[in-house]
Amino acid sequence: MKASELRTKSVDELKKELLDLLKAQFGLRMQLATQQLSNTSQMSKVRRDIARVRTLIREKAVQQ
C-alpha cells in the first residue's frame, strides 16, 4: 500500500484501515507462533503499513 493512496482517504477510513492491519498482524503473529507462516516478510510489510497509516492519521490531526 502506497502513502499516496492513503493520503486520499479520510481519517475515519484510515482508522478502519489501521484496525484491519492490526488484525492482520495479529493473525500473522499467531501463524508464526504455530509455525504455519511460510512467508515471514509479510510481518515487516504489515508493520510498515501500520506505521504509514499511523503517520498519516497524526499528520491529518496536526493539520486540523
From Swiss-Prot:
The keyword Translocase does not apply. One of its GO terms (biological process) is translation. This is Large ribosomal subunit protein uL29. Belongs to the universal ribosomal protein uL29 family. Keywords: Ribonucleoprotein, Ribosomal protein. Pfam families: Ribosomal_L29. The keyword Repeat does not apply. GO terms for cellular component: cytosolic large ribosomal subunit. Coiled coil: none annotated. GO terms for molecular function: structural constituent of ribosome.
